[in-house]
Amino acid sequence: MLGAALRRCAVAATARAGPRGLLHSAPTPGPAAAIQSVRCYSHGSSETDEEFDARWVTYFNKPDIDAWELRKGINTLVTYDLVPEPKIIDAALRACRRLNDFASTVRILEAVKDKAGPHKEIYPYVIQELRPTLNELGISTPEELGLDKV
């Protein structure tokens, strides 16, 4: 969609160019051009927070998720400018446990701590919310493993 819009813009610029590539003054665009430019930049509907959370919980709860899909999901989730909700992290930790991938559980918890950044109250809150899951699955936090001192 974006490629087509760029092609239309390039064709329009070429059509206005003179013999030596200099742009001639073009007539003032009418209202149809304004509507067209608005359409060129629309990107569809945005996702609500609840839909975002549900999408990621569903992704990590897939019974047939493999190690590659798990890592891909974690990598994608970490690239967003947010700290994932505890229910998303819970689903990811359970997927790690189904795959017996302890290293990914530690990586997820370290990523959450890193994403919290200077807001020191976020990481303890997430760990508090995840404590029943961590105990159930037998997962230690990076602090309990001594990895925060390295």
Swiss-Prot record:
Motif SIFI-degron location, chain numbering: 2-17
Subcellular location: Mitochondrion inner membrane
Subcellular location, principal: mitochondrion
Post-translational modification: In response to mitochondrial stress, the precursor protein is ubiquitinated by the SIFI complex in the cytoplasm before mitochondrial import, leading to its degradation. Within the SIFI complex, UBR4 initiates ubiquitin chain that are further elongated or branched by KCMF1.
Pathway: Energy metabolism; oxidative phosphorylation
InterPro entries: Cyt_c_oxidase_su5A/6, Cyt_c_oxidase_su5A/6_sf
CDD domains: Cyt_c_Oxidase_Va
Keywords: Acetylation, Heme, Iron, Membrane, Metal-binding, Mitochondrion, Mitochondrion inner membrane, Phosphoprotein, Transit peptide, Ubl conjugation
BP GO annotations: mitochondrial electron transport, cytochrome c to oxygen
Cellular compartments per GO CC: mitochondrial inner membrane; respiratory chain complex IV
Membrane topology: Peripheral membrane protein
UniProt modified residues of type N6-acetyllysine: 87, 113
MF (Gene Ontology): metal ion binding
Gene3D superfamilies attached to this UniProt entry: Cytochrome c oxidase, subunit Va/VI (1.25.40.40)
Transit peptide residues according to the UniProt entry: 1-41
Known function: Component of the cytochrome c oxidase, the last enzyme in the mitochondrial electron transport chain which drives oxidative phosphorylation. The respiratory chain contains 3 multisubunit complexes succinate dehydrogenase (complex II, CII), ubiquinol-cytochrome c oxidoreductase (cytochrome b-c1 complex, complex III, CIII) and cytochrome c oxidase (complex IV, CIV), that cooperate to transfer electrons derived from NADH and succinate to molecular oxygen, creating an electrochemical gradient over the inner membrane that drives transmembrane transport and the ATP synthase.
Complex formation: Component of the cytochrome c oxidase (complex IV, CIV), a multisubunit enzyme composed of 14 subunits. The complex is composed of a catalytic core of 3 subunits MT-CO1, MT-CO2 and MT-CO3, encoded in the mitochondrial DNA, and 11 supernumerary subunits COX4I, COX5A, COX5B, COX6A, COX6B, COX6C, COX7A, COX7B, COX7C, COX8 and NDUFA4, which are encoded in the nuclear genome.
Family, similarity comment: Belongs to the cytochrome c oxidase subunit 5A family.
Name of the featured protein: Cytochrome c oxidase subunit 5A, mitochondrial
Gene name in the database record: COX5A
